[in-house]
Amino acid sequence: MAKEKFDRSKEHANIGTIGHVDHGKTTLTAAIATVLAKNGDTVAQSYDMIDNAPEEKERGITINTAHIEYQTDKRHYAHVDCPGHADYVKNMITGAAQMDGGILVVSAADGPMPQTREHILLSRNVGVPALVVFLNKVDMVDDEELLELVEMEVRDLLSEYDFPGDDVPVIAGSALKALEGDAEYEQKILDLMQAVDDYIPTPERDSDKPFMMPVEDVFSITGRGTVATGRVERGQIKVGEEVEIIGMHETSKTTVTGVEMFRKLLDYAEAGDNIGALLRGVAREDVQRGQVLAAPGSITPHTKFKAEVYVLSKDEGGRHTPFFTNYRPQFYFRTTDVTGVVNLPEGTEMVMPGDNVEMTVELIAPIAIEDGTRFSIREGGRTVGSGVVTEIFE
């Protein structure tokens, strides 16, 4: 059977279900796919198929994640659902499943629970732009006032973590009833997806962002100059444009005088391309792995930042023992390791393998970073943690 061609005419967005264990995230995921399948462009998915999520490796961390896709009239969605709480934490911190928006599932029978709070906090820290709420299991609640109370609690909780709690759409329904084909509850799923379509902003495509390419390798071509190679992470670069060389040393400027891909000369390159960029007037020793080429003024070098970090458990090949403030591992950003010193928050004595923690880091050399930059923490070449920058200090 020939593979279907991916339809690019529709907007694409990545979303995921978040919320407390057993509040119905996976049932909702199955219900969305099943209800949308009745309306056309989507393949129905069973609960079991989603629940038996395959293991994936991301930055050396094992994560169970189910990926499904479905379509509304407006968009094509890639939806990620995780079976376990630990999988969520890892998923959000490593960026294994980049989320342009989330559906927060809260059981109307229980109200917000500890993981509800934790997932909202994580969404805020890792930069999920918008959340929509699905109050699930409303068929189990007879009291209209109780529903209103739960909705208020959820809105307050969202506001507490800097989401616009008063404006976030809240849809009440029952994923199980929708999955069983109850027309009233199927409509609630369509209402939810309408809210997701309308409320979650269309993500900016990588190729529309300012240019950046992490440098992987550098060599000189006699008579032509210095070439930096790497994969364009975002944006586009055209021959003749200026770029900055950022990280490790003082930032410098140069002009890209040639772009090559697979030994062919190009006029321009864009996000996803593996290229060699010929740099005017740059000596081979002026560029090194770990730096980035970037559109002038788009990203700056820093040494001190706050980050949300997941520490690998012993079973995942991580440390066997806890670490404390002043721990000095390597921080691996894009293509290189830089030593850094860890400062734990007040009241956190130590961090155990398997924990997630917010920490402050000071690197010994500046690196091009911004909010949302991902990194790994390594010791002697093995990964012991994974993190995302949440705030920059200096």
Curated annotation (Swiss-Prot):
Pfam families: GTP_EFTU, GTP_EFTU_D2, GTP_EFTU_D3. It is found in: Cytoplasm. Residues 10-204 form the tr-type G domain. Residues 60-64 are annotated as: G2. GO terms for molecular function: GTP binding; GTPase activity; translation elongation factor activity. Gene3D superfamilies: P-loop containing nucleotide triphosphate hydrolases, Translation factors. Its EC number is 3.6.5.3. Residues 174-176 are annotated as: G5. Residues 81-84 are annotated as: G3. GTP binds at residues 19-26, 81-85, 136-139. Keywords: Cytoplasm, Elongation factor, GTP-binding, Hydrolase, Magnesium, Metal-binding, Nucleotide-binding, Protein biosynthesis. Residues 19-26 are annotated as: G1. One of its GO terms (cellular component) is cytosol. It catalyses: GTP + H2O = GDP + phosphate + H(+). Residues 136-139 are annotated as: G4. Mg(2+) binds at T26. NCBIfam families: EF-Tu, PRK00049.1, PRK12735.1, PRK12736.1, small_GTP. Belongs to the TRAFAC class translation factor GTPase superfamily. Classic translation factor GTPase family. EF-Tu/EF-1A subfamily. Monomer. GTP hydrolase that promotes the GTP-dependent binding of aminoacyl-tRNA to the A-site of ribosomes during protein biosynthesis. This is Elongation factor Tu. It comes from Staphylococcus epidermidis (strain ATCC 35984 / DSM 28319 / BCRC 17069 / CCUG 31568 / BM 3577 / RP62A). The lineage of its organism: Bacteria, Bacillati, Bacillota, Bacilli, Bacillales.
